Each structure stands twice: as structure tokens, then as C-alpha cells.
């Protein structure tokens, strides 16, 4: 069984992604083994145990149930992303708008890569780099978020106050790296506050 598509276009999609304090992505809950997949594996084990050639039997069972696919490009036009990370030392949340980009060579047999760019607030810029196994994202996924020239009034909880003082103005540059290997998440980040001006104490 094989499905091959040249192009898929997503117009004005919306995505809400959140990393909680336990460093778990909300999107990971959407990826789970289906009952049919579990049943196939159970049947394969049972067949193998009764067969004189268990390896060949398991391979045959997998071959009969697998489904391969390929999509040349997935285009994203005018998308919105609500992004938040509660695991940072100062939790970060913002909205990315006018997201444009492409996910290339989506295939069930090898990693897929994509790049996306969007706007944050009035003048901020965001870039997202993505590499994952589309058929098994928990096994291997790499995501990099880059935020540049973000006005602090356009993000929370930085907006409003900082260390007990009102923020009059300031810019935020932030890089967030997430690397998932075999369901284990490792992350790193770089935070830079530029031209931060504090007002009265609150």
C-alpha cells in the first residue's frame, strides 16, 4: 500500500503548542499507538511462537499491515501559532502570526525537514526549524524556535513587569532548542534582553 502526493497546502492553519513544567509537549498526546497496531503486533508474536521460522513470520506480518506514504511538499500559508513554554526559568508565551513555510519530502521511510517564518507583535520576527520522523515523532524530533526583536509588551509573562518593576520598553531575543530521542526531551535556550527600561516599582 502506497500513497504519493505532490503538494498539500494548508491555508490559515492554527496550532497551539505548549510545553508544561514537566517538559511534556501537549502535541505528544496526539501520538499514540492505535489498537489495530497493537493487535497486529500481538498477532505477529503469536504467529512467530508457533512457527518454525519466527523471524520470517514476523517480517511477513509487518509487510502485510504496513502503509507507506510520500508527500513532496506541505505548504503553510498565513498560519497562526500560540506557543508557550512553562519549563523556562521565566515562563514564556506568545503568538506567532502570518506564518509561512514548507515541510519538504514527507516520507514514511526517512526524516522530514521544514522551515517556517512568522511575525510576533508589531515588529518581532520568528523562525522555526523542524526535523522529524513523520511516522514516529517520539523516536526522533528536533525543533528550533528563534525569536528576534520581540517587544516585551507582546509576550507574557514578561509584559507588564519585571523583578517587581513596570516595564516601559525593551526587546527580547530568544532561541529555544528541543530534541526528542526515544520519547526523552532535551532542551537548551539562550535569552537576551536588550534596551530594557524599567519604570516605577509595583
Predicted regions: what they are:
Residues 1-5, 10, 15-19, 58-67, ...:
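Extended lipid/amphipathic-ligand handling interfaces
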Residues 1-98, 182, 193-202:
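Secondary-structure transition motifs
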Residues 122:
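An active-site-proximal beta-strand-loop segment
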Amino acid at each position: 500500500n502506497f500513497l504519493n502526493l505532490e503538494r498539500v497546502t494548508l491555508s490559515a492553519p492554527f496550532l497551539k503548542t505548549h510545553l508544561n513544567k514537566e517538559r511534556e509537549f501537549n502535541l505528544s498526546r496526539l501520538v499514540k499507538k492505535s489498537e489495530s497496531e497493537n493487535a497486529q503486533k500481538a498477532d505477529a508474536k503469536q504467529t512467530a511462537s508457533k512457527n518454525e521460522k519466527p523471524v520470517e513470520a514476523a517480517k511477513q506480518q509487518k509487510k502485510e499491515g504496513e502503509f507507506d506514504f510520500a508527500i513532496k511538499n506541505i505548504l503553510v500559508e498565513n498560519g497562526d501559532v500560540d506557543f508557550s513554554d512553562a519549563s523556562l526559568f521565566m515562563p514564556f508565551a506568545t503568538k506567532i502570526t502570518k506564518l509561512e513555510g514548507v515541510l519538504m519530502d514527507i516520507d514514511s521511510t526517512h526524516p522530514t525537514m521544514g522551515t517556517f517564518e512568522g511575525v510576533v507583535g508589531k515588529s518581532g520576527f520568528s523562525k522555526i526549524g523542524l526535523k522529524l520522523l513523520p511516522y514516529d515523532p517520539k523516536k526522533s524530533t528536533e525543533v528550533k524556535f528563534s525569536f528576534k526583536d520581540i517587544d516585551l509588551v507582546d509576550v507574557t509573562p514578561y509584559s507588564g513587569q519585571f523583578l517587581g518593576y513596570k516595564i516601559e520598553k525593551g526587546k527580547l531575543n530568544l532561541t529555544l532548542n528541543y530534541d526528542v530521542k526515544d520519547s526523552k526531551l532535551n532542551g537548551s535556550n539562550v535569552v537576551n534582553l536588550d534596551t530594557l527600561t524599567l519604570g516605577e516599582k509595583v
